[in-house]
């Protein structure tokens, strides 16, 4: 009796499931796929973090393009610069301008209406236009330079209180990048000294962390549609996070509406709302706030921590950067953003950090709106396409001694920059769906890193090498947070006198 009631229906379901998906794929010339795919689950059994390293190993066996099956969802992984060029240029770039749909984005990102989650079309193009012309233009970023400088000065002052002590840098770098973004968007300081509302700040920080933890493909229903009926607890959690975040964003929006003279991104968008309310709805503005606060904070802090870790492990590079800053700027004034153009080695350090330690090693997945071909293989409509930037950045066919930290490699143009070479280095993605905040991210990382080098002498704790292992999550953070020793240089006394004056 048990056999007929339980086992037989299950066997029939598995057979029907396999036949259904086999019939859907038999007409396609799909990229090669690893064996040992499980019924229903597909290749979920292979997913051993860090996933970017796993995909790199699979590419060694199956080639620079291979396919995986996660439940009912097919994924294709790209691991070569030439194939990335095929994805991010021409008609394919348009076809691949959609995002896969995940449960977290449905609730947190206002039903896929934010710039990072919206499907390709008129709404997304309008959001991208707003980002490019209104909130992240060169003029707008220049207007907010005083915020970046003030937050960096505050970080330097906090560091100066703990000279010759072991300092964990991650909290300071996180406060720097969060405050920079939140002040630009709303005018508030949420972390460190002189916060506007400490209780609200703590709630906001936890919300951002919880949303990041839930982001991506965490829910079985994202891959197995029939599992949605069993995923109530996860869905309730995501809904609660979305409601809590929306409550904070709405409150911040209302505060900016009352402060009509404020000089923030939200105030600027509200002024545009007066003339074009159909483009600048409250939901659109909250979605832009959300994207800036979540995507624009963690990545810069992570990159800065990797950069400082690399320099401490390569003291000759740290000394070379310090000499460049001393020769070009000296110890009479602090480094400023216009100086960066005259500091090529500092720029090389940032580029090399982006190469070795991209904050999003698999970029953000895309999904084609129609069947396309990549590398001679079929990529059917709706496939989740991932580009392994981490693997491309370490490809020995593209880079000399790819595992080594060598900022000098960018002096000779090894980093590319035009044509197909632009897809050798792509920490912010490429094509139509590349990160709109790339310019801002580079500005804050380069200025903050230059300031840390100019203002302090740095040493490793107990002379021990810095561990460069990454965590297994979607964002490539350091597994062991960076701790270091610092000693103030002469410029710090001038900065402190200036701040007191």
Swiss-Prot record:
Cofactor(s) annotated in UniProt: heme
Residues annotated for heme binding in this entry: 435
Gene Ontology terms, MF aspect: heme binding; iron ion binding; monooxygenase activity; oxidoreductase activity, acting on paired donors, with incorporation or reduction of molecular oxygen
Subcellular location: Membrane
Broad class of the protein's primary localization: membrane
One Pfam family recorded for the sequence: p450
UniProt feature coiled coil, ranges: none
UniProt keyword annotations, A-Z: Heme, Iron, Membrane, Metal-binding, Monooxygenase, Oxidoreductase, Transmembrane, Transmembrane helix
InterPro entries recorded: Cyt_P450 (IPR001128), Cyt_P450_CS (IPR017972), Cyt_P450_E_grp-I (IPR002401), Cyt_P450_sf (IPR036396), Plant_Cytochrome_P450_Monoox (IPR050651)
PROSITE patterns noted in UniProt: CYTOCHROME_P450
Associated pathway: Secondary metabolite biosynthesis
Enzyme class: oxidoreductase
Transmembrane segments: 288-308
UniProt GO BP: indole glucosinolate metabolic process
Function, as annotated: Involved in indole glucosinolate biosynthesis. Catalyzes hydroxylation reactions of the glucosinolate indole ring. Converts indol-3-yl-methylglucosinolate (I3M) to 4-hydroxy-indol-3-yl-methylglucosinolate (4OH-I3M) and/or 1-hydroxy-indol-3-yl-methylglucosinolate (1OH-I3M) intermediates. These hydroxy intermediates are converted to 4-methoxy-indol-3-yl-methylglucosinolate (4MO-I3M) and 1-methoxy-indol-3-yl-methylglucosinolate (1MO-I3M) by indole glucosinolate methyltransferase 1 and 2 (IGMT1 and IGMT2).
Protein name: Cytochrome P450 81F3
């Amino acid at each position: 009796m048990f056999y007929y009631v339980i086992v037989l229906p299950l066997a029939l379901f598995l057979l029907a499931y396999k036949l259904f998906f086999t019939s859907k794929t038999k007409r396609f010339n799909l990229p090669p796929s690893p064996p040992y795919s499980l019924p229903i689950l597909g290749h979920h059994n292979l997913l051993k973090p860090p996933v970017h390293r796993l995909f790199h190993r699979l590419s060694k066996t199956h080639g620079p393009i291979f396919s995986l099956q996660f439940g009912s969802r097919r994924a294709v992984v790209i691991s070569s610069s030439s194939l990335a060029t095929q994805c991010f240029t021409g008609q394919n770039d348009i076809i691949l301008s959609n995002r896969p749909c995940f449960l977290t984005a449905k609730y947190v990102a206002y039903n896929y209406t934010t710039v990072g989650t919206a499907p390709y079309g008129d709404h997304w193009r309008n959001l991208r236009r707003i980002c490019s012309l209104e909130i992240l233009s060169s003029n707008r970023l220049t207007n907010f330079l005083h915020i970046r400088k003030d937050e960096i000065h505050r970080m330097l002052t906090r560091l100066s209180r703990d000279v010759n002590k072991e300092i964990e840098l991650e909290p300071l770098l996180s406060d720097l990048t969060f405050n920079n973004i939140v002040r630009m968007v709303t005018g508030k300081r949420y972390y460190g000294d002189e916060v506007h509302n400490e209780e609200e700040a703590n709630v906001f920080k936890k919300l951002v962390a919880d949303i990041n933890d839930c982001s991506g493909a965490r829910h079985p229903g994202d891959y197995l549609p029939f599992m949605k009926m069993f995923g109530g607890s996860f869905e309730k959690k995501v809904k609660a996070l979305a409601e809590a975040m929306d409550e904070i964003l709405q409150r911040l929006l209302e505060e900016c509406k009352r402060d009509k003279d404020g000089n923030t991104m939200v105030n600027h968008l509200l002024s545009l709302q007066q003339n074009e309310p159909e483009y600048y709805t409250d939901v659109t503005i909250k979605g832009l706030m959300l994207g800036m606060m979540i995507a624009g904070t963690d990545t810069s802090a992570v990159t800065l921590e990797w950069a400082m870790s690399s320099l401490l492990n390569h003291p000759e590079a740290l000394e070379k950067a310090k000499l460049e800053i001393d020769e070009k700027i000296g110890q009479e004034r602090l480094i400023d953003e216009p100086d960066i153009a005259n500091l090529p080695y500092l720029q090389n350090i940032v580029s090399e950090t982006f190469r070795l330690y991209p904050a999003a090693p698999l970029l953000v997945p895309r999904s084609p709106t129609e069947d396309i071909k990549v590398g001679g293989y079929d990529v059917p409509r709706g496939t989740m396409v991932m580009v392994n930037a981490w693997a491309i950045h370490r490809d020995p066919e593209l880079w000399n001694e790819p595992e080594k930290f060598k900022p000098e490699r960018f002096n000779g143009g090894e980093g590319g920059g035009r044509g197909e070479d632009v897809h050798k280095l792509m920490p912010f993605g490429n094509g139509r769906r590349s990160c709109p905040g790339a310019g801002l991210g580079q500005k804050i990382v380069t200025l903050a890193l230059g300031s840390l080098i100019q203002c302090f002498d740095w040493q490793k704790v107990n002379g021990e090498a810095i561990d460069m292992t990454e965590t297994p999550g979607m964002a490539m953070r350091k597994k062991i947070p960076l701790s270091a020793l610092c000693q103030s240089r002469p410029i710090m006394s001038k900065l402190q006198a200036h701040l007191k004056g």
